[in-house]
Amino acid sequence: MLLELALGLLVLALFLHLRPTPTAKSKALRHLPNPPSPKPRLPFIGHLHLLKDKLLHYALIDLSKKHGPLFSLYFGSMPTVVASTPELFKLFLQTHEATSFNTRFQTSAIRRLTYDSSVAMVPFGPYWKFVRKLIMNDLLNATTVNKLRPLRTQQIRKFLRVMAQGAEAQKPLDLTEELLKWTNSTISMMMLGEAEEIRDIAREVLKIFGEYSLTDFIWPLKHLKVGKYEKRIDDILNKFDPVVERVIKKRREIVRRRKNGEVVEGEVSGVFLDTLLEFAEDETMEIKITKDHIKGLVVDFFSAGTDSTAVATEWALAELINNPKVLEKAREEVYSVVGKDRLVDEVDTQNLPYIRAIVKETFRMHPPLPVVKRKCTEECEINGYVIPEGALILFNVWQVGRDPKYWDRPSEFRPERFLETGAEGEAGPLDLRGQHFQLLPFGSGRRMCPGVNLATSGMATLLASLIQCFDLQVLGPQGQILKGGDAKVSMEERAGLTVPRAHSLVCVPLARIGVASKLLS
């Protein structure tokens, strides 16, 4: 009995000794309430039952109408705070980002399939700062990106040839599928120097990144690797790892031969993986780059640059089909600047302001990540409420993009709003770099997407090329080509990492005069 009492007192003493001492800041926040929350909160699942019948951004809009622009939920056992105004976005992502909101939330799938090395997801710290600097200074700097421009041009020409062949045969093309092939091949060529083998595995990775499991939100289950979800992660990892191992081995040999002065025929030089392998061999680097770091970065580039750009481009094409006056105005600009005798080049987009405005308007209405996520790393006060440490923070970017308080006629696809200045509700020169909090398709602050320029430039180039070369004929339910006012496509959404269209965009391309023969030749 005395022994049990002594052990109990020892455990209590250890608990009191190891428990974090409350800081002056945490003591000051004790009297503050949590943001308002719906009732009831159910055992085990929290408020997840309130989200089951709608896409997340729609469910959060409904809840914000009842509980205000800042409210709290429980996703299982995880406290969650939802913000839905630009003013709140700025408080979280600018005013308090450095101290409390500089880390992203990651699911079990993201953590394991990025080898716990994702620069997009790892906690803020020395590794993140080092790799982020490496990406910006060595992988996405102007010199490297410009050097790889022929690769990007090659992939766009390949896409246009598929369109030209479809036009010549007058057969329907699944543009949803072709756009994914384009973005996947482009990223794969720039990252690895090859395009084919990794494509299908990358799609599986992206699909599971857009899904959640109860184990991600219920604390007792968090570290259990059980169930179908975890088995899928294992299966994907078992397929992906041997492929990327083979590519790394191949590129390492190419880098070695080039260092020895050999000419390696038929292989692309200067791809991102070559640079990473050179850094991995550099013993003077402040952080040693391991093979797992490289694998994680490969997944990062695929997840950031494949699905999001393809889905955004598809949304843009759907909007252009449904808004023929916008399409005609865009075509007039392309013909005026580029003409009909040569194909659009990436550098032309700097002289195509209306095309760039179409890209911005697409991201306003269809942001790649409709709900941006962060994690609270230190307790904080926002608008008189306490935000608890460890809370998941959700920013409903989709809601702000459709809010009439911040946008004039927000349900209309009107690129002109990004070219007009001075009028109330107009955007004028707003950019996509995260400093205008009513427009955050790529996030903001330290954790915003580093590839925003590459993504928007590629999207603008492909859109301008398609507008220059083809009309898209929409099919009806019986496979017939629709004409006039009937030539519309559905704008219904479905769940996914980037919330794509619910239905594939299937069209019959119609080549404009003289273009098909140039592409096919």
Curated annotation (Swiss-Prot):
Catalytic activity, per the record?
(2S)-liquiritigenin + reduced [NADPH--hemoprotein reductase] + O2 = (2R,3S)-2,4',7-trihydroxyisoflavanone + oxidized [NADPH--hemoprotein reductase] + H2O + H(+); (2S)-naringenin + reduced [NADPH--hemoprotein reductase] + O2 = 2-hydroxy-2,3-dihydrogenistein + oxidized [NADPH--hemoprotein reductase] + H2O + H(+)
- InterPro entries reported in the protein's UniProt record: Cyt_P450, Cyt_P450_CS, Cyt_P450_E_grp-I, Cyt_P450_sf
Coiled-coil blocks: none
**Where does this one sit in the cell?**
Endoplasmic reticulum membrane; Microsome membrane
What Pfam families does the annotation carry? p450
Report the SUPFAM superfamilies cross-referenced here: Cytochrome P450 (SSF48264)
Instruction: Name the residues that bind heme.
Output: C449
Record-listed E.C. numbers: 1.14.14.87
Q: What is the protein's name according to its record?
A: 2-hydroxyisoflavanone synthase
